[in-house]
Every structure is written in C-alpha cells, then in structure tokens.
Swiss-Prot record:
Pfam families: BCD_RFX (PF25340), RFX1_trans_act (PF04589), RFX_DNA_binding (PF02257). Residues 189-264 bind DNA. It comes from Danio rerio (Zebrafish). One of its GO terms (cellular component) is extracellular region. This is Transcription factor RFX3.
Length: 765
C-alpha cells in the first residue's frame, strides 16, 4: 500500500477481497488504548505506509510498530452483505472480550472493483479512502462502495471523505506553513470544489482553468487564495485518482487534469460560455483567410497575443477544446469542401460590375470554408456569428446588461463587397440558383463530416449536440439575414431546412440502429422472431396488398425468402444493411439512366412501407411474442431504405442528397402541387380538360403561382401520367410579341426551349 505522497499517477496494487480476511494481531492493552474509537473516526486520521503478507504496520506520529499477524479465522458473509452499498461499508468482529471497543485507522486509498465473471471480484487499493477496522480479534479492510454487478472492470475515481479533507488541510498546514486562521478558510474552498466539480471518465480540464475558476471564487467571496502549487495538492486530495496529461498542439500544449469536469448544474458552465462568447465577439473574422478553430484564430488583439505574435488560447477556449477532442474521433475531419460552379449572371446588372461578382464568389467560398472548419471542431455556436458577419448583421447585442457591438471584421468585408451591391446581387435570380447549389454542396459535406456512417455508434452527448445544432439553424440564419431581400432569405432557409431535417433523420436512424443492434445480437430473440414470422400467412398478405402495391408476385416471394434466410443466419446489422442495399439495387435496376427513376424510387418506398405494415398487422393480430422486436426492426429498415433511396436518386440525377430533399423544404413559397410533383395530373383534372380543349402539344407548363412554373410532359410515364421535367421562375422567361391565336411565345433565359403561353399554362412551340 502506498502513501499519499506517492502521487495520484502511481500504479495501484490489487488485493483480492475474500469473505474470510480478519487477522488476529498481538496488540497490548496500552496499544489498543492508543487507537481512536470508531465513534471518533472522523476526527483522527492515521496513515498506513506499508502492508505486507505477514505483517501489518501502523505509521503513527511517535512510534512505528510492526505487529505479526495471528491465526486467521474464517467468517462467512452473504453476497448482499458484501456487495450492497451502504453508508459505511465496514465489517468487523468483536470476539475475544465483550468490553473491548472496535478501533479504526483510515487508509488513504482508492477503490476499484473488477468482476472476474464468476461472482467474485478483486478490490484494488490505491491512494485514498479505505478503512482498516480493528476489534479485539480482527483487522478488516473496508471500502466505501463496491460494484459487483458490472460485466467489466468498474474502476473509477472517488471523492474524499470528511476525514480525508481534514487530513488534506493538515498536510497543507505543514507543507505550506499556513496559519490556523487561513487553514480554517480552506473548508469553504473545499466545499466549493465539491459543489462545482465531479469526476468523470474520458474528459479533462486545463489546470489553469481550474485555478482561474478558484481565483474568481476567492475574489467574489473576498477570500485569500492559496498559490497554484497548493491548489494542485488540494485538488488531488479531494478528487482522487486524477491523472495529468499534456494536451494541445506542439508549442502550445497545456497540462490538463484528466478525469474531472465541471458539474452540469454548476454556474461555472455559464461562466465558460460567456467567456467564449466575449472572446468571439471581440474577434474580427478575417474572411481572406480560412477560419480556424478557436485555438488557431488570428486577429485577436490585446493580452491574448504572445511576443511571437501567436494567439494564446484563454482558459475557456482550452476547456472547450479539451472537451471536444473525445467527440472528434467520431467525425470525418478529412473531408474537404467541393469546388463551386462559376457564377454567371448572363446579363449586366445595374450598379454591379464583374469585380463585384468575383468578390461575391470569393467571399462566399471563404465563408463556406469557415463554416466547415468550425463544424469539424464542433464549435456550433460560432455558425451564427459567421452568418451575421457575411450578411452584414449590424445590430448590437446584449449579454447580462452589457451591450456588445459587432466586430470590426465587417469593415474588411465591406471594403471587398459593399453591402449595397450585395443586396443588388441578392435580387438576381442567377445568384439565387448559384448560391442554392453551393449550399447543397456545403451542407452535404457537413452531413458527411458529422455522421460519416449512420450505422456506427455515436455517443449520446454528440447526438444531442447535433440535434440541438439542427434545431437552432433556421432561427440563426433568419435573424442574420434580417436586412436581406426576402427571396434570397427563402432560398437560403430552404437549403438550411433540408440540412437540419437531414441531421435529425440521420441521428434518429443512428439511434434506431444501435437499439436494433442489440436485438440482432440476441439469439433467443432472433429464434422467436423466425418462429413468429413462419406463422404469418404471406399469401393472404400478398392478396391484400396486391391491389395497392401492384407488386410482382415473384419479387415479393423472393424478398420473403431472402428475409427469412438472412434472419435465420443471425446476420449482423452490417449484413442486414448490405441486404437492404442489394434489394434497392435490384428494384431500381430497370430504371437506371432513365428520368423516371426518382418516381420509381418513391413508389418503391411507399410499397415497401405498406407491405411491411401488413406483415406487422398480421403479427399483431396473432399476438406474436416478438412483436416489439419486429416493430423496432421495421422502423429501422424503413428509415434505412429511405436513406438508400435518396442517395440513389441523388446519384442518378447528379444532385446531392441534400439537394434532392431540398426540393420539398420551402413549403411557404411552393404550392401543394409542387410538393407532389408526380401527382400533378391527378390533382388538377380541370387543367387536363383545358389542355384537351386547346389541343396543345405533349409538353405543357402549369403556372400554379405567380412565381413558380412547372414543366410537365404529358403521358411520359408508363401509367400515362405526366412527368415533371423541371421548375422555372417567371423572371427567367423573356416575353416575345404576341402571335396569332392569342398565343404568347416565350424563350427561357437558359435557352433550353421555346414555349407558348395559353391562360395559366405554357406549352412548347
């Protein structure tokens, strides 16, 4: 056993914990009298320096004596007695004389319980916390808590007892020469530490951050702080088992305490957020350079610069960096931003020159790269600031009564592209289309960074952070663009809404995948599912679903057999994913390189969902024991099918998955006909009658709103319905002189075709 001076990083020895461990020492009455009674164990603490197999040595102030162990006597304890947690956790025997009082010596040590799989465990005695309790007949090492139910080692740091706190104060008194008056103040310091910090695995805090928090506390309470070295000893005496690590980039690394964090309900969390917010607001974002994470920000003036001109991260920044490092291993930080297409206005715009168009392209590229950088570093709260800077949001903000003016980086951007010219460009339809395309590329890259594999386990804290980020996006962007033309706002919000919805869907899919993984790994559940599935009357299911789905009977039977075979093989989640991907490939193969693939893909999703719901209904009516497992699997497979199909459609159309989903996001500016493009001919029979009376050619357009025109091709689908060729804005159409028969010809700005306008429809000439 080691002394407290050995340091928290020392190797912990392991002593097997058995049900018969008392030892009978040869202790004289005088020596027993010198011990401290159990009732007073919180007042006196004695350190045990060494424990040998045949000897027990007590380290006392005056006399160090070694006593030979006596005859070992066996005691029986039940498992509930041994492993249940209670306030003391001490076991001792009072044999040998009714009048002898039990004695206690507190050992400074940590505890960890390792389960070896057969119901027994080993207790590791480390550096502080256990107790050796003696009576007339035995000594027993007792721990504060043990966990024998865990399937793996449950080693963790523990918090000090009141006796250990007093010992820490006494140690500081001796080592630092503190007066009794100053040492009495340490109680409040220690209580503050216990109220605001807790031990946790996988996290760290910079040593400077803890000390800065402590200095702030002392300043607020008008207390005299101890120096940094004494504070470090105080931390280690309270939170046992802390390790020290040096984290950070080369030349700018800092020492961190590993295994401690700020409590979630501590006011220090708010302090850290405010410090980071203030540092950000004072940071002029230099758009001509790629925006870097907090620890690499350029342009901060004042005391945060070292003599070499490099930015020295503040304590709050270091804390944020350290806490994000654990989650960054789940991201794909190697992904770069794709190249953007060139912006071509097609015609001159009054008040805007070619240099302004070039400046917009350059600034927006740098803006998107900055967004990608902060997302890679999980600094989601910086996105709002980047948007406000680019879109010239100039309103002042207030934090706790302090008015903060926006950073001076606006002037640098204003010099490259004045706000008035930016607004002129934002009114041009070509800029809307170009920026929408750029946004889809950027948001798709962000999705693949944050969730590179939807089936890979993601920490719940990271999942929640992503979902909170998605929830805030639309509000941040709308607020930042408050002075921008509404049409541009609609374009931007449509893209960011698709991005937010994709993040929500993918995190939900990931959550379902982890829940289903446990089911697929359970052999008994799989066997029960297979047994219940074999009782389903699939012929009856096919008969009921055939009128709605109109699926080929051979395809349905093949899918049924493949599903049962895959289930019987007890396939893993990844194997099921490969099977689902193969199903999508087989179903969509006849539509490859055809414009009808998007509709065929959507129809497949509807049919898959309807057919699977019929199977679930049959299982429900039969009261299948595995109904819950099937319901979970069905939810996962439906969602994963959606994921696969949207990527197949994106690949076939040359769009991103975000772009495919973005077609349906802007519901405020699109009519219901635009939401269900493939069903326009069924939804508007009046239009069909009008077109028949006018005897129009095969291609037609329906002007459903003043600002949206749909391009339809009559009879293009196998069932005779009309396929949607595309959507254009009226501003892209240049009117020509009217022709005979009351027809008005128009030519698209893109030069794709010539169309004829009749009433509220457009038809090709």
């Amino acid at each position: 056993m080691q002394t407290p001076e050995a340091g928290a990083d020392s190797t912990v020895s392991t002593v097997p914990l058995q049900t018969s461990v008392p030892v009978q020492p040869a202790v004289s009455g005088q020596q027993v009298a010198s011990q401290v009674p159990v009732q007073q164990q919180a007042q006196t603490v004695q350190q045990v320096q060494h424990v040998y197999q045949a000897q027990v040595q007590y380290v006392q102030e005056e006399n160090n004596s070694v006593y030979t162990n006596g005859t070992i006597r066996a005691y029986s304890y039940s498992e509930p007695q041994l492993y249940n947690q209670n306030s003391s956790g001490n076991y001792f025997d009072t044999q040998g004389g009714g009048g002898s009082a039990a004695q206690v010596s507190t050992v400074v040590s940590t505890h960890s319980m390792a389960n070896n799989g057969n119901g027994t465990g080993a207790l590791a005695m480390g550096l502080t916390g256990g107790q050796i309790i003696s009576s007339s007949g035995a000594y027993l090492i007792g721990g504060n808590s043990m966990d024998g139910s865990a399937p793996h080692g449950a080693a963790q740091t523990t918090r000090a007892s009141p006796a250990t706190i007093e010992m820490a104060i006494e140690t500081l008194q001796k080592s630092e020469g503190l007066s009794s008056q100053r040492s009495s103040l340490l109680n409040s310091h220690l209580q503050w530490l216990l109220d605001n910090y807790e031990t946790a695995e996988g996290v760290s805090l910079p040593r400077s951050t803890l000390y800065n928090h402590y200095l702030r506390h002392c300043q607020e309470q008008k207390l005299d702080p101890v120096n940094a070295a004494s504070f470090g000893k105080l931390i280690r005496s309270i939170f046992m088992g802390l390790r020290t690590r040096r984290l950070g980039t080369r030349g700018n690394s800092k020492y961190h305490y590993y295994g401690i964090r700020v409590k979630p309900d501590s006011p220090l969390n708010r302090l850290q957020e405010d410090m980071q917010y203030m540092a950000l607001r004072q940071q002029p974002v230099q758009q001509k350079q790629r925006f870097k994470p907090v620890q690499k920000m350029d342009g901060v003036s004042g005391d945060n610069f070292s003599s070499a001109g490099q930015h020295t991260p503040s304590a709050a920044e270091q804390t944020f960096i350290a806490q994000s490092q654990h989650h960054q291993q789940f991201l794909d930080g190697s992904r770069a931003l794709p190249e953007f297409v060139e912006l071509d206005l097609g015609e001159a715009v009054d008040g805007v020159g070619p240099e302004d168009v070039k400046a917009l392209q350059t600034l927006y590229r740098e803006h998107c790269e900055a967004i990608l950088d902060v997302v890679v570093n999980l600094q989601f709260n910086l996105i709002e600031n980047l948007w406000q800077t680019f879109w010239r949001y100039s309103a002042s903000s207030s934090v706790e009564g302090v008015t903060i003016t926006e950073n001076s980086g606006l002037s640098e951007i204003e010099g490259r592209l004045p706000r008035a010219r930016l607004i002129l460009l934002c009114r041009h339809e070509a800029v809307h289309k170009w920026m929408n395309t750029c946004d889809h590329l950027m948001y798709q890259a962000l999705v693949e960074i944050l969730i590179p594999d939807v089936l890979r386990p993601i920490p719940s804290a990271l999942t929640q952070a992503i979902r909170n980020f998605a929830k805030s996006l639309e509000g941040w962007l709308t607020n930042a663009m408050s002075s921008i033309p509404p049409r541009m706002i609609n374009t931007k919000v449509s893209a960011v809404s698709a991005f937010a919805q994709t993040l929500r869907r993918y995190t939900s899919l990931n959550h379902l995948a982890q829940a289903a993984r446990a089911v697929l790994q359970n052999t008994s559940q799989i066997n029960q599912m297979l047994s219940d599935l074999n009782r389903v009357d699939f012929a009856n299911v096919q008969e009921q679903a055939s009128w709605v789905c109109q699926c080929e009977e051979g395809v349905v039977q093949r899918l049924e057999q493949d599903f049962k075979a895959t289930l019987q093989q007890q396939s893993s989640l990844e194997q099921w994913a490969a099977w689902l991907d193969n199903v999508v490939t087989q179903i969509l193969k006849p539509y490859e390189d055809k414009p009808t693939l998007p509709k065929a893909a959507r129809q497949f999703l509807l049919k898959w969902s309807f057919y699977s719901s019929m199977v679930i209904r049959d299982l429900t009516l039969r009261s299948a024991a595995s109904f819950g497992s099937f319901h979970l699997i069905r939810l996962l497979y439906d969602e994963y099918m959606f994921y696969l199909v949207e990527h197949r459609v994106a690949q076939a159309t040359g769009e991103t998955a975000i772009g495919v989903m973005g077609e349906f996001q802007d519901l405020n500016t699109m009519s219901p006909a635009n939401i269900d493009k493939d069903e326009v001919s069924e939804m508007d029979s009046d239009l069909d009658e009008e077109m028949e009376e006018a005897d129009e050619p095969l291609a037609k357009r329906e002007k459903v709103e003043a600002d949206v025109i749909q391009v339809l091709q009559v009879g293009a689908m196998e069932d005779g319905s009309s396929a949607v060729v595309g959507i254009v804005q009226p501003s892209m159409i240049n009117s020509l002189p009217p022709t005979t028969n009351n027809h008005s010809e128009h030519i698209l700005s893109t030069g794709t075709s010539t169309i004829r306008h009749v009433g509220n429809t457009y038809a090709s000439v």
